[in-house]
Amino acid sequence: MAITKLSNIGTPQGGGAAHLKNCISYILNSDKTEGLVGGNAGTTPQEVYQVMMDTKQEWEKENGRQGYHFVISFPPGEATKEEAYAVINDFCEEYLGENFDYVFSIHTDQKHMHGHIVFNSVNRMDGYKYRYEKGDWEKYIQPITDRVCEKYGLPPLVYDPHNKIGKSYAAHYAEKE
């Protein structure tokens, strides 16, 4: 039962795209990925960053939100790195297609297999910025993850919006310290 988590990559104080560059570098850290990298924007941090910045410049959309970072996580022992790669590759192809520059990687450095996706905030086909609306996770994003997981014989997420058992980010972070 993979779960998809979402976050945006904003512009740092003073402008620029340092957060985007740092996020790309983090997800492509070779100490974590074992070379399990894919996407349509390149395979090195420099190449991916340049492709995304070129798209922003082409459409004159260099300000504001720079990109998005999704994480798809599997419980320990549920998915192999090859299955995780296939799930995340298919998720990206279905959800992002060729509309957005993206890169993804599988991190194998934890007990649980998980993949990171970073995609550009600017649609490379029409120049519009990606918009996440309240409810998109439940209506579109997690159902794609579930459908792709089932395609590979992995269970879907059992989600009850009235019985939230997860921890808030603050609670999770406090436990780590």
Label each PLM-derived region with a short phrase:
Residues 1-177:
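N-terminal nicking endonuclease/strand-transfer module with a His-rich metal-binding environment
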